[in-house]
Design a protein with these regions (language model features):
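ATP-dependent carboxylate-amine ligase
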Residues: 2-19, 30, 43, 55-56, ...
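ATP-dependent carboxylate-amine ligase catalytic core
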Residues: 24-29, 55-163
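Acidic, Mg2+-coordinating active-site environments of NTP-dependent enzymes
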Residues: 30-32, 104-105, 124-275, 300-301, ...
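Short beta-strand segments
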Residues: 36-38, 111, 134-136, 179, ...
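A conserved segment at the C-terminal end of the G1
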Residues: 37, 45-61
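Residue-level detector of alpha-helix initiation sites
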Residues: 41-45, 114, 234, 388
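Short, acidic/turn-prone active-site loops that include or flank metal/cofactor-
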Residues: 63-66, 136-139, 201-204, 360-368, ...
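Short beta->alpha connector loops
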Residues: 113-117, 182-183, 282-283, 365-366
Length: 424
């Protein structure tokens, strides 16, 4: 089994380097100023925030954050989203396009994931960004790092993930911006060559949030959004302030036209007056805390939470879901609806033992929808966070069916996968 795993890993790296070799021809011809954004959560929101400031002066890796995807993006291609035969096309098209396709923007703002060990490092060694923005650090894909910890390479999964993300800091040429509250980020950037700026909560002067809007009073001015934004987004805004100051560019503060990435804390109107906050794109403890804290800041009645499993937690699964139970037990939700095997097994007992909340759990997503349709009266604000295709539940509760455009996993492949769960 280990031999097969190592063979797959070697093949992955070989193929990634193949595409990197060809895409680099186009990149060298383009020669943009590269700003890399990485972290466990919040990368895509940070990418979208930079777009509000740079507009057409930059190209953004909206559909790519992996070793393969970034190479495809540089030559103007998308990765494999449907047929696997597209791999054959890409093996031919990437070399061909590398000789004639060139982006023209001054900046390349690229989102980089750390899902697999060595993936961030491969991109860091290649791109060598002028600026690295390290947004966050958490156990987003912990399952992929368990073997590194078991081998003795790292003391724990947190150290392993931090080291991988830090490769972008180690290879940054000029500037690295980090969360000053993270000791691991500070440790990993102590001896790097680039200048390090650690942002802190002192940059946030005040925070006001409602289901339909948010205002952050920051050092440079007040940022206004038309969606509910977690308080933790002050970090991205503070990082944005530091980036714009470094580049000598003016900041746009009115962000009411800003559209949050799909499945991230988006406000949607539900049937019969119910207010829906869709944050179903992903879920790990760090993002769960962020959204629960956001709801706690809202001075409104009848707060509900629909919480699904946190996947890809590996050996940390029980621990992380138990902590989730403690988080929810301390919240001010009027009703908590749990959906999935993991939250039923680990999270539910913690909330029940606390005894302060009305809580129900379901292992089937359809049963959760049935419960909501029977019990929602129209005065509730409902947070959706977690796996188990909760975006399908949101879809069924929408007042305007066209708002499915704002939901995650709406492509044909995703709809086909959820259909196997009986969710049509």
């Amino acid at each position: 089994m280990k031999l097969v795993h190592n063979a797959k890993k070697a093949l992955y790296i070989f193929v990634a380097k193949y595409f990197r070799f060809w895409a680099n021809i186009s990149l060298r011809r383009w020669h943009p100023r590269i700003i890399a954004i990485t972290g466990s959560v919040g990368k895509t929101t940070m990418l979208h925030l930079t777009e509000t400031q740079f507009d057409h002066d930059a190209h953004y890796s909206h559909f790519a954050n992996s070793a393969f995807g970034v190479a495809f993006d540089i030559v103007g291609l998308r990765g494999v989203t449907t047929s696997k035969w597209r791999w054959l096309y890409l093996f031919i098209a990437v070399p061909v396009r590398s000789f004639f396709y060139t982006h023209t923007e001054d900046f390349y703002i690229v989102e980089i994931d750390g899902e697999r060990p060595r993936e961030t490092t491969l991109l860091a060694e290649w791109l060598k960004p002028e600026v690295t923005i390290w947004v966050s650090l958490g156990r987003s894909h912990a399952v992929y790092y368990d073997k590194l910890v078991a081998s003795g390479a790292f003391a724990n999964v947190d150290d392993a993930i931090a080291y991988e993300f830090a490769s972008l800091a180690r290879h940054a040429k000029k500037l690295v911006i980090i969360d000053g509250a993270s000791k691991l980020m500070q440790q990993q950037t102590e001896k790097i060559d680039a200048k390090v700026i650690a942002v802190s909560k002192s940059a946030l002067r005040a925070y006001h949030v409602r289901p339909e809007s948010t205002t952050f009073e920051m050092t440079s001015g007040d940022f206004t959004f038309h969606d509910p934004m977690p308080m933790e987004n002050y970090l991205q805004l503070a990082m944005l302030e530091e980036l714009m100051q470094y580049l000598g560019r003016d900041i746009t503060h009115d962000l009411r036209s800003f559209i949050v990435p799909v499945g991230r804390n988006h406000f949607l109107r539900g049937a019969h007056g119910v207010k829906l906050i869709d944050s179903t794109y992903n879920a790990h403890l760090i993002s769960m805390k962020s959204m629960v804290n956001m709801l706690s800041e809202m001075k409104i009645a009848h707060k509900w939470a629909v919480i699904g499993d946190m996947v890809e937690q590996g050996a940390s699964e029980a621990e992380e879901h138990t902590k989730l139970g403690e988080l929810l037990a301390d919240s001010d939700f009027e009703q908590i609806v749990l959906v999935g095997r993991r939250v039923t097994q680990y999270t539910l007992p913690v909330i029940e033992q606390d005894g302060r909340h009305t809580v129900v759990s379901f292992t089937k997503t359809q049963d959760a929808l049935d419960y909501l349709q029977q019990h929602l009266k129209g005065e509730e604000t409902v947070l959706f966070k977690g796996s188990q295709y909760l975006e399908w539940v949101v879809e069924k509760l929408l007042a305007d069916p066209t708002d499915t455009a704002f939901l995650a996993r709406q492509d044909k492949a995703a709809r086909k996968r959820r259909a196997t769960w009986g969710l049509n």
